[in-house]
C-alpha cells in the first residue's frame, strides 16, 4: 500500500489521533499494534494474530489485551508531570493513584504494579479495598479510600495504616468522622485523613454530574469548616493531610480543568490559614482520552494532551502556593481512564450481512395505479438531460409516492408484487441520487447522510453491545470501530453494526468518519460471504466491569498479548469466558437440574434410543459451551 493510500485510511478512521501511536495501518492494509511507541520495532499485525489464534482454537468474540500499553500509559503520564514540575520549578512530588473501579482485572492491576513506575491505588468499596490492600506491598504503598464507608471499611483502611501503608481515608460525609476516630482509638493508630471538597466548578458532557455542587460526593464549604473544628476539638487536626476534589470524568475542555484546579487551590490556601497542614493535593479524575480523534471539546474527545494537562495542574497549584507563601504539596491524580482505555481491543466476526441490493425494474403496466406511474415518471426524468428539478426534489417525490404505496398496501389497494416493485425502484433512485451528490457541497451533506443511512449494509456481529460496550448503549459513547484488514482499499461502502441480542437497542449508532461523526461506518469493499473481522478499540476502561448479562451473553474470552523487539509475540489466556452454565447459575438456574429435567422429557418421547442419546449429548455440550455463536 502506498503512503498516500495509508494516509487516506488513517484520515478516514482518524487512527493517527485516537490510535496515539499504539495502532496503525501497515503496508498490507491491516491494523498493526505497537504496545510501546518508544520501541517501534516491537509491533504485531493484529489481523494475522487473530487468524493464527483462531487456527489454534481461539473463539470469537475475544478481548485482545496489551499490558505493555498500560505500562507505557503510566510512564507517559508520569513523564508529563515530571516535565511540568521541572518547567515551573515545582518542588512537590507527583503520584498517579490508579482507581481500580475503572478496571479491576488482575492483569491491569499487576501490569501497572510491575511497571517499575511510582504508583498508588484507590478503592471505592470494601471489596476494592481488600484487593488494594493485598497488592499494596508491591507498590510505594499510597492508598486512597473514597466512597461511602461503614465501620468495616474504615477498620480495613486503618489496619492498612497500622501495617505501614500510607492510607488516606477521604471523608465523603460528616457521619464518617466519628466512626474513624472511634476505630482509630480502638486500634491505637493515628488516622491519615483526606477531605473531598465539593466545588462550584463543573465540567461538561456525559459525565458532568460527577462533579460540581450537585455532585453525589463531597462536603460543602460549611461542612469542610465543621470537619476542621471537629478534628481540632478531638486533637486530630494533624491527621487531615489530603485535599481531594473531582470535576468529572472524561473532561473534554482544558479550560474547565484549569478553572476547577484554581478553585480547589483556594481550598488549599484557606485550609492552611485554618491551621490544617495539607500535604497532598488530589485532583481526582478527569484526564480524558480522544475516542473520536477529533481533538475537540465534544463529549468523546479532548482538546488537550498529557503535557498541557500536567502543565495546567502544576502551574495552578504552584502559583497559588507562591502567591501565599505555602509549601508545594504532593500532587495526586486518579487517571484511570487515560491509563486503561487504549490497552484492550474487542475482536469479533461478522455472522451475516444484509445488503440493499437492487435491480432497476421494468416500466409499470399502463393501467398500474397512479403512485407507481408517478414513481416511474420521476425515474425517467432523472435521466433526462437538462432537467431543472433538484436532487432533493426528486428524492422527496419518490419518498411521498413510496409512502402512499405502503399505506395503500396496508389497506389492500396494492399487491405484494407492486410494493416490491416500488421499493426496488426507490432503491435505484437513491443510488442514482447518491452518484450525483458532492460531499464538498454543504447543501448536499444532509441528503448524503440520509442516503448513506438508508443504503448502508446491515452487519450482524457476534457480540453483545450490553456486555462488551455498555457505555455505547447507556450513554451513547462513541468507540473507534473498523475492520482489521482491507484497509488498503477505498472505503466505498457504508455499514451499520448490529449485535446478536434480541433487543433493538443492540446497535451502534455513531461512527468515526474523518473529522466528523456519522450514523454509518465507512467500509472497504468486501466479500459478503467472507466479511472481515472487526475491531472495537479503546474498550479497556469501564466496559468489562459495567457489562451486563442481557440475554445471558457472558464475559468473552480474553488474551494478554506481549510484543517484543525481535518480532516475537507471546499470548496468554487470561479469561476463558463464560459458559452457558456459568450464566444460568448467575440467575439461580442449576445446569445439572436443567440437564436432568431435559433428560426426563427426552425419555418420555417415542424417539429411538440413539436419537435420544444424541439430543442429550448436544444439550449437555451446549450447557458447557460458549455463550456466543460458534462455527459448526
UniProtKB/Swiss-Prot annotation:
One Gene Ontology term of the molecular function aspect: metal ion binding
Keyword Oxidoreductase: no
Cofactor: Mg(2+); pyridoxal 5'-phosphate
Function recorded in the entry: Catalyzes the biosynthesis of agmatine from arginine.
Reactions this protein catalyses: L-arginine + H(+) = agmatine + CO2
Top EC group: lyase
Record keywords: Decarboxylase, Lyase, Magnesium, Metal-binding, Polyamine biosynthesis, Putrescine biosynthesis, Pyridoxal phosphate, Spermidine biosynthesis
One Pfam family linked to the record: Arg_decarb_HB
Family: Belongs to the Orn/Lys/Arg decarboxylase class-II family. SpeA subfamily.
Species the sequence originates in: Escherichia coli (strain SMS-3-5 / SECEC)
Gene: speA
Pathway, per record: Amine and polyamine biosynthesis; agmatine biosynthesis; agmatine from L-arginine: step 1/1
Residues carrying N6-(pyridoxal phosphate)lysine: 101
Database matches in CDD domains: PLPDE_III_ADC (cd06830)
Annotated substrate binding sites: 281-291
Protein name stated in the entry: Biosynthetic arginine decarboxylase
EC number: 4.1.1.19
Single GO BP term: spermidine biosynthetic process
UniProt keyword annotation of Secreted present: no
Amino acid at each position: 500500500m502506498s503512503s498516500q493510500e495509508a494516509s487516506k485510511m488513517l484520515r478516514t478512521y482518524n487512527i493517527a489521533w485516537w490510535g496515539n501511536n499504539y495502532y496503525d495501518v501497515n503496508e498490507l492494509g491491516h491494523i498493526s499494534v505497537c504496545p510501546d511507541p518508544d520501541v517501534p520495532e516491537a509491533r504485531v499485525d493484529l489481523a494475522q494474530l487473530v487468524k493464527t489464534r483462531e487456527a489454534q482454537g481461539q473463539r470469537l468474540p475475544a478481548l485482545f489485551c496489551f499490558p505493555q500499553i498500560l505500562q507505557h500509559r503510566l510512564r507517559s503520564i508520569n513523564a508529563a508531570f515530571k516535565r511540568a514540575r521541572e518547567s515551573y520549578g515545582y518542588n512537590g512530588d507527583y503520584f498517579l493513584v490508579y482507581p481500580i473501579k475503572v478496571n479491576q482485572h488482575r492483569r491491569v492491576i499487576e501490569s501497572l504494579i510491575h511497571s517499575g513506575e511510582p504508583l498508588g491505588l484507590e478503592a471505592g468499596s470494601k471489596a476494592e479495598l481488600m484487593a488494594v490492600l493485598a497488592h499494596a506491598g508491591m507498590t510505594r504503598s499510597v492508598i486512597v479510600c473514597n466512597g461511602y464507608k461503614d465501620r468495616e471499611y474504615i477498620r480495613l483502611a486503618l489496619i492498612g495504616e497500622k501495617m505501614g501503608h500510607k492510607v488516606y481515608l477521604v471523608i465523603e460525609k460528616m457521619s464518617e468522622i466519628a466512626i474513624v476516630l472511634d476505630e482509630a482509638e480502638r486500634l491505637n493508630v493515628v488516622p491519615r485523613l483526606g477531605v473531598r471538597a465539593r466545588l462550584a466548578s463543573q465540567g461538561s458532557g456525559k459525565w458532568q454530574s460527577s462533579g460540581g455542587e450537585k455532585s453525589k460526593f463531597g462536603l460543602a464549604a460549611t461542612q469542610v469548616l465543621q470537619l476542621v473544628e471537629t478534628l481540632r476539638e478531638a486533637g486530630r487536626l494533624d491527621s487531615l493531610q489530603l485535599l481531594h476534589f473531582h470535576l468529572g470524568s472524561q473532561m473534554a475542555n482544558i479550560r474547565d480543568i484549569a478553572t476547577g484546579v484554581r478553585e480547589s487551590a483556594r481550598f488549599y490556601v484557606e485550609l492552611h490559614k485554618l491551621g490544617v497542614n495539607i500535604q497532598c493535593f488530589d485532583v481526582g479524575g478527569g484526564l480524558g482520552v480522544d475516542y473520536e480523534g477529533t481533538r475537540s471539546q465534544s463529549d468523546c474527545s479532548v482538546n488537550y494532551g498529557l503535557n498541557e494537562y500536567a502543565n495546567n495542574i502544576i502551574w495552578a497549584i504552584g502559583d497559588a502556593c507562591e502567591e501565599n507563601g505555602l509549601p508545594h504539596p504532593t500532587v495526586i491524580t486518579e487517571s484511570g481512564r487515560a491509563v486503561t482505555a487504549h490497552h484492550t481491543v474487542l475482536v469479533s466476526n461478522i455472522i451475516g450481512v444484509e445488503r440493499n441490493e437492487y435491480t432497476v425494474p421494468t416500466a409499470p403496466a399502463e393501467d398500474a395505479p397512479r403512485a407507481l406511474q408517478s414513481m416511474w415518471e420521476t425515474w425517467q426524468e432523472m435521466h433526462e438531460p437538462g432537467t431543472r428539478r433538484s436532487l432533493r426534489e426528486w428524492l422527496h417525490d419518490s419518498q411521498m409516492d413510496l409512502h402512499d404505496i405502503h399505506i395503500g398496501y396496508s389497506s389492500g389497494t396494492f399487491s405484494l408484487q407492486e410494493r416490491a416493485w416500488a421499493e426496488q425502484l426507490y432503491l435505484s433512485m437513491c443510488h442514482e441520487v447518491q452518484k450525483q451528490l458532492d460531499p464538498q457541497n454543504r447543501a448536499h451533506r444532509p441528503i448524503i447522510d440520509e442516503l448513506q443511512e438508508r443504503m448502508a449494509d446491515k452487519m450482524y456481529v457476534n457480540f453483545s453491545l450490553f456486555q462488551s460496550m455498555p457505555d455505547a448503549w447507556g450513554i451513547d459513547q462513541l468507540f473507534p470501530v473498523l475492520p482489521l484488514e482491507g484497509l488498503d482499499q477505498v472505503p466505498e461502502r457504508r455499514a451499520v453494526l448490529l449485535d446478536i441480542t434480541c433487543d433493538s437497542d443492540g446497535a451502534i449508532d455513531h461512527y468515526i468518519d474523518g473529522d466528523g461523526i456519522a450514523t454509518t461506518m465507512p467500509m472497504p469493499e468486501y466479500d459478503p460471504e467472507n466479511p472481515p473481522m472487526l475491531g472495537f478499540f479503546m474498550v479497556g476502561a469501564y466496559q468489562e466491569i459495567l457489562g451486563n448479562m442481557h440475554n445471558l451473553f457472558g464475559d468473552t474470552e480474553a488474551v494478554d498479548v506481549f510484543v517484543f523487539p525481535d518480532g516475537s509475540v507471546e499470548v496468554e489466556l487470561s479469561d476463558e469466558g463464560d459458559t452457558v452454565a456459568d450464566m444460568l447459575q448467575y440467575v439461580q438456574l442449576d445446569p445439572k437440574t436443567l440437564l436432568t429435567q431435559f433428560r426426563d422429557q427426552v425419555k418420555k418421547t417415542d424417539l429411538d434410543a440413539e436419537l435420544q442419546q444424541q439430543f442429550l449429548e448436544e444439550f449437555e455440550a451446549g450447557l458447557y459451551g460458549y455463550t456466543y455463536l460458534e462455527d459448526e
